[in-house]
């Protein structure tokens, strides 16, 4: 299979692109081209009958090659006797330049909460981003306590909520995860954003999403400069939808900041190679365009842009917002 790559453009070129009257058709064609790229990989562990109870859906597989493999807490190696003990529906996903920057996971179910916390401790994860409502059924099981000083217990893992901070658009909690068998504790920073639409109606609140990404990135930088941290864990009710959008915007913004360039299709392709079924729908891809577009308008990266292009773009922001909104009013999807 040949190597697939997409064109990288400057910020100026990206801004010019978003001003085109045929932008929606361009987005659809670009997404169609993405979907035609054959991805390498197998889904053998996802398909095992023994693991079916650990999957929320049969429609969205988990790649073998990038999956998180649960290990024995005592030996540090995968279990030999019980193949289901190594499995969790979660994959490592690279950042723009950082390998395994994220773990993209399905939202915990009642029977997978213990595995979820085992993964958090095993991979030294200190940040969790939840992009879903909690209903203990369809969307997400309550794997942490949304009340100060309360505890949740899953097997040998005790999760105590130490602090809850209500930000403008999300809830930030500080948790203490303890492995009671080995007397090991780890502090967790939990970001809970519930304003994602359950279906693909518009609008998605771009400033809110960007605010969330900023705070998550800020916390990660703080941890990396002090105690260190493993991957950022992200999950959503749709298994892959909003998780894929979050990672796409995060990585694209990293490229914008570091290199003053962007390649949205290449960013999506790289994520799809690690997390099966990510950005499957062109509407998801359009959302990525919209949010990135607004991010470039609001970040300090404008100092690197052509001022004439920037001014022209500013003049048309209202029209573009109306355009995107109109397209989403016409196309609403309930298929994930």
UniProtKB/Swiss-Prot annotation:
Domain of life the protein comes from: Viruses
Describe the family membership recorded for this protein in Swiss-Prot or TrEMBL. Answer: Belongs to the protein-tyrosine phosphatase family.
Q: Where's the Tyrosine-protein phosphatase domain?
A: 27-295
Q: Which Pfam families match?
A: Y_phosphatase (PF00102)
**Taxonomic placement:** Viruses, Viruses incertae sedis, Polydnaviriformidae, Bracoviriform, Microplitis demolitor bracovirus
What Gene Ontology molecular-function terms does this entry list? protein tyrosine phosphatase activity
User: Which species is this UniProt entry from?
Assistant: Microplitis demolitor bracovirus (isolate Webb) (MdBV)
Gene that produces this protein: H1
Among InterPro entries, the record links this protein to: Prot-tyrosine_phosphatase-like, Protein-Tyr_Phosphatase, PTP_cat, Tyr_Pase_cat, Tyr_Pase_dom
For this entry, the protein name equals: Tyrosine phosphatase-like protein H1
Q: Please list every transmembrane segment annotated in the UniProt record, as residue ranges.
A: none
PANTHER family for the chain: RECEPTOR-TYPE TYROSINE-PROTEIN PHOSPHATASE, TYROSINE-PROTEIN PHOSPHATASE 1
């Amino acid at each position: 299979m040949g190597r697939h790559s997409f064109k990288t453009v400057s910020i100026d070129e990206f801004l010019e692109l978003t001003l085109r009257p045929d932008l929606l058709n361009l987005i659809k064609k670009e997404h169609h081209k993405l979907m035609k790229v054959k991805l390498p990989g197998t889904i053998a562990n996802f398909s095992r009958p023994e693991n079916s109870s650990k999957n929320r859906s049969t429609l969205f597989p988990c790649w073998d090659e990038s999956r998180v493999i649960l290990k024995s807490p005592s030996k540090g190696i995968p279990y030999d006797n019980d193949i289901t003990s190594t499995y969790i529906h979660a994959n490592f996903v690279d950042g723009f330049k950082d390998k395994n920057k994220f773990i993209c996971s399905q939202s915990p179910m009642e029977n997978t909460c213990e595995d979820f916390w085992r993964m958090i401790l095993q991979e030294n994860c200190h940040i969790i981003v939840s992009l879903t409502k909690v209903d203990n059924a369809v969307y997400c099981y309550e794997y942490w306590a949304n009340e100060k000083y309360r505890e949740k217990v899953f097997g040998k893992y005790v999760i105590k909520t130490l602090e809850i901070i209500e930000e403008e658009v999300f809830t930030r909690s500080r948790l203490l995860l303890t492995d009671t068998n080995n007397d090991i504790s780890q502090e967790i920073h939990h970001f809970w954003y519930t304003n994602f639409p359950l279906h693909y109606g518009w609008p998605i609140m771009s400033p809110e999403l960007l605010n969330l990404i900023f705070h998550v990135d800020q916390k990660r930088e703080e941890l990396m400069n002090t105690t260190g941290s493993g991957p950022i864990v992200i999950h959503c009710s749709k298994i892959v939808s909003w998780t894929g959008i979050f990672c796409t915007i995060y990585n694209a913004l990293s490229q914008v900041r570091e290199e003053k360039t962007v390649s949205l299709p290449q960013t999506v392709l790289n994520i799809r190679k690690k997390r099966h079924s990510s950005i499957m729908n062109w509407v998801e891809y359009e959302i990525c365009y919209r949010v990135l577009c607004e991010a470039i308008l609001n970040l300090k990266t404008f100092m690197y842009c052509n001022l004439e292009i920037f001014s022209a773009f500013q003049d048309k922001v209202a029209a573009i917002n109306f355009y995107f909104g109109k397209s989403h009013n016409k196309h609403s999807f309930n298929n994930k």
